[in-house]
Amino acid sequence: MLRIPRDEPVLFASDTHLAPEAPETAERFLAALEREGPTAPHLFLLGDLFELWVGDDCADPLAARLAAILSGLAARGVAVRLMRGNRDFLLDVPRPGAWDVPYSARCGATLLDDPCPLELHGVPALLAHGDALCTDDLVYQQWRATCREPAWQATFLARPLAERFAIGRGARETSEAGKREKPGALMDVNAAAVDAAMDAADATLLVHGHTHRPATHRWRAGGAERTRVVLTDWDAPAGRGALLRWEDGRAVA
């Protein structure tokens, strides 16, 4: 298990949704990485870095810029760790018969499992993207299970890149339209699912993104206090988006 000592600060981010259609948000995030990335020895990016990711053969200028920044941080000694989200669940998934360089390798980063247990400043913790905890949304959970099956991924990644982009854009539009029809509570985490995940990991701290509802929640379960930290999404025109700094056992920014 990964253990991060109390004297080593950590930076967290998720849900940056990098896309050519959102240049201000991309600049906000990349500038934050360049400015703050060197100030902490650990950087965790917990999914949905990209609004759309259809394979590691994407020749995306934003992806190239991000990889250059992250590999630069890694060269300076920062431990960079990535996690897949619901938008970029195909990160590092190999295409049949291809020899693409995994995106995490281009970034000098380590790809994490979701969820990922660790000891953070002496506290048993769990990191997750967060979508697996939204168990009330049965339609999404069925899709999530399907698109993570190796056979489905191999079939999809065998398609030409242009076709994959077209399918991905269509799926994104359908998803956004569906969100407008769903009750807000349906797209939030389920409390029982949160407790079950934390029980399984023996964790008292959970850090996740996905819901775009930044907050810190505290409650008691099994006689112990638990904390759930929800990371912000990034949307520069709306004024949202900042790296969360964890220092001396608590969030300080």
Where are these predicted regions, by residue range?
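Short, surface-exposed linear patches
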Residues: 32-36, 65-68, 103-105, 147-151, ...
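Core catalytic region of metal-dependent phosphoesterases/phosphodiesterases
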Residues: 2-9, 13, 18-120
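A broadly tuned preference for mixed-charge, low-complexity surface segments
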Residues: 63-69, 91-103, 140-143, 171-189, ...
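N-terminal short leaders/motifs
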Residues: 57-76, 181-186, 193-206
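Conserved beta-sheet core of the metallophosphoesterase superfamily
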Residues: 101-113, 124-126, 131, 135-143, ...
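Active-site-proximal loop/helix segment associated with metal-binding centers of metalloenzymes
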Residues: 128-190
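Hydrophobic/basic alpha-helical segments enriched in Actinobacteria
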Residues: 8-10, 15, 21, 27, ...
